[in-house]
Regions:
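Amphipathic alpha-helical segments used for helix-helix packing
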Residues: 107-129, 177-185
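Hydrophobic/aromatic residues within well-ordered alpha-helical segments
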Residues: 20, 63, 70, 74, ...
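Short, structured helix-loop boundary elements
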Residues: 21-22, 42, 64, 68, ...
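C-terminal peripheral helix-coil segments that are non-catalytic and often amphipathic
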Residues: 1-8, 104, 108, 136, ...
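Short acidic/histidine-centered micro-motifs embedded in hydrophobic/aromatic stretches
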Residues: 115-119, 133, 166, 170
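Helix-turn-helix
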Residues: 23, 27, 31-65, 69
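Hydrophobic alpha-helical connector segments
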Residues: 83-114, 152, 160-167, 196-199
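Amphipathic alpha-helical linker/stalk segments
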Residues: 68-97, 139-147
Length: 213
């Protein structure tokens, strides 16, 4: 009887812990994107998360542990649309969905892109194993899918890795260089439809380049 009584309480604690962890990761993403690993402090992250520092340390004992968890969460979010490429689907439509999803991520989570860019510029010391492991595995698998589409004549001849790199570069530009874009385009960036206009430009450039002629 005690076990049945304890289970709802344990489930509630699990939900609270999951929610707290999610809150800490979101706060870490914001603060790390603003200050980098060196400039960020656990005090500021805890304040942003709306909890005490000791409470936060229950979930992440070191700043580097939290930083690594934030980066891995970012990469997981980014890899989901790539991993969703269906080898049996229409190549152009599959790429259209992927590119659109990447642009949406850049607009909705620009801090994540800037945080990742900072880690790359530093030589990726905290996620090098992740990059050469899980990331490489997914990219290699999807590169084989793109190569198959090319060999079947369903895509124009293109190196699959460089296509993936080009998609990353063009979509993440809108997050990494947001300040430059706003400086050059001014009020245009705040007008309704600007995001859709940017997405369509990227889609047109990339998809016309891989459409069989």
């Amino acid at each position: 009887m005690d076990q049945l009584t304890d289970r709802p309480a344990e489930d509630a604690r699990t939900r609270i812990q999951a929610k707290n962890r999610e809150t800490i990761l979101a706060a870490g993403r914001e603060v790390f994107a603003r200050h980098g690993l060196r400039g960020a402090t656990l005090d500021e992250i805890a304040s942003t998360a709306g909890m005490s520092k000791p409470n936060m340390l229950y979930y992440f004992r070191r700043k580097t542990d939290l930083y690594r968890a934030v980066l891995e969460e970012v990469l997981t979010d980014w890899l989901l649309p790539l991993d969703a490429l269906d080898p049996e689907g229409d190549p152009i439509e599959e790429l259209r969905r992927y590119i659109s999803a990447k642009i949406k991520l850049s607009y909705e989570h620009p801090q994540a892109s800037r945080l990742f860019a900072g880690e790359m510029l530093a030589g990726a010391p905290h996620i090098e194993t992740y990059l050469s492991g899980e990331l490489k595995e997914i990219v290699d698998r999807k590169a084989r899918t793109i190569s198959r589409w090319v060999s079947e004549g369903r895509l124009a001849p293109i190196d699959p890795y460089h296509l993936i790199f080009a998609i990353w570069a063009m979509t993440q530009h809108y997050a990494d260089f947001d300040v430059q874009i706003r400086a050059l385009l001014g009020k245009q960036t705040g007008k309704p439809g600007f995001q859709e206009q940017a997405a369509q430009a990227v889609l047109t450039i990339l998809l016309k380049g891989v459409t069989p002629r």
